[in-house]
């Protein structure tokens, strides 16, 4: 359950920080956030979650990655 919560929180933070910055940049183009700012926001959200909960769950933060590893036999469903 601890791993599940860590992955859920990491995915939430990635969507909130990364996608939120993209929405913010599109909504206020005069601020000049641009592509580099959005890319930096995505990178920093992954970095913060990797340090915060990566040691607990492995830090996939993307259900597609977990599913792909499970389908390839490199990740058990109970993990």
From Swiss-Prot:
Annotated site, Involved in tetramerization or stability of the tetramer, chain positions: 19
Alphabetically ordered keywords of this record: Cell membrane, Membrane, Transmembrane, Transmembrane helix, Transport
Annotated site residues (Selectivity filter) in this chain: 42
GO MF annotations, alphabetized: channel activity
Entries under Gene3D superfamilies matching the protein: Glycerol uptake facilitator protein
SUPFAM superfamilies given in the database record: Aquaporin-like
Motif extent (NPA 1): 62-64
Function of the molecule: Channel that permits osmotically driven movement of water in both directions. It is involved in the osmoregulation and in the maintenance of cell turgor during volume expansion in rapidly growing cells. It mediates rapid entry or exit of water in response to abrupt changes in osmolarity.
UniProt record similarity statement: Belongs to the MIP/aquaporin (TC 1.A.8) family.
Record protein name field: Aquaporin Z
Species name: Flavobacterium johnsoniae
Gene: aqpZ
């Amino acid at each position: 359950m601890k791993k599940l919560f860590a992955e859920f929180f990491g995915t939430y933070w990635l969507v909130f920080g990364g996608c939120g910055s993209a929405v913010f940049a599109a909504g206020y183009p005069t601020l000049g956030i641009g592509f580099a700012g959005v890319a930096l926001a995505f990178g920093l959200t992954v970095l913060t979650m990797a340090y915060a909960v990566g040691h607990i769950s492995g830090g996939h933060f993307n259900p597609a990655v977990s599913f792909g590893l499970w389908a390839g036999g490199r990740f058990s469903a109970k993990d």
